Amino acid sequence: MDANGVDLTRLDGVFVRQQTQMADVGYLVFGVPYVTANKYQVFSLPPVAHEWVPTAQEVAGFEEIMFIHEESDTSDRVGWAFLGAASLRPLQYHFGSTSTGQMFTAVKSFKIGGWCGCPWEMDVLSGPPGDQILKGQVVQNFTPYCSRCFDAFCLATTFIDVVPASSFPGKDARFTVRTSLSCCGRVNNCCAPTCCRPKAIFDILDNSGKLVGVVQKHFVAGEGGEACCRMCLGVVNFSLKFPPQSSGEERALLLSAIMLNESYQPTA
């Protein structure tokens, strides 16, 4: 899938930067139960080492190739924020090319989580509104149940399956994104990404459990007070290194899987 303008198979990976929205700072300071619709810039990931830590100067020099915009109802953002559960709100992520516009859409419905038999999921669609084609799903993996409960509640680890439409109806995962926020995983991600530990590293596994790619979540140094503000608000920067043999469709699904996982991460 070339996503109508951006051939994802030609990229080693992408760097995604959530835009700082100062209105969120005001809502937080004054205790207003509201969150703004999130917006992200997507850049082509330059050839970088595994332990890359981006600087503000590097990020400023990146060329934007895509954007991601959240579409959600204002009433949902107010209502769920009032309940302290803004991450549960239904939404759509519109992925677009800076040159050609809309590329594909990821639709997230209301799901509490696999712990109660309601795993997170998003449908990934391409095509114009009213004539969209399902390209696949990204869904929280909660099987076996007891093991995944232990992973989630004791190890702060979640698993998101990437399921291309070609795998239906069996829904066999092509990749799994393993996100660990603790010190107990393959990489110690405790207190990351912050000024103390500038990156967290998450794993992309193939259907045999082999490590085939990584996602790095970054604290971008050199931005002064803005960097600290972004950290406290949970505003994200992450880089996604695509598995070498993945198709364009699979890469779009992997990017959607990261967005699904991010949409459920707690923020300030």
What are these regions (language model features)?
Residues 1-123, 127-268:
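Low-complexity or membrane-interfacial segments used for flexible interactions
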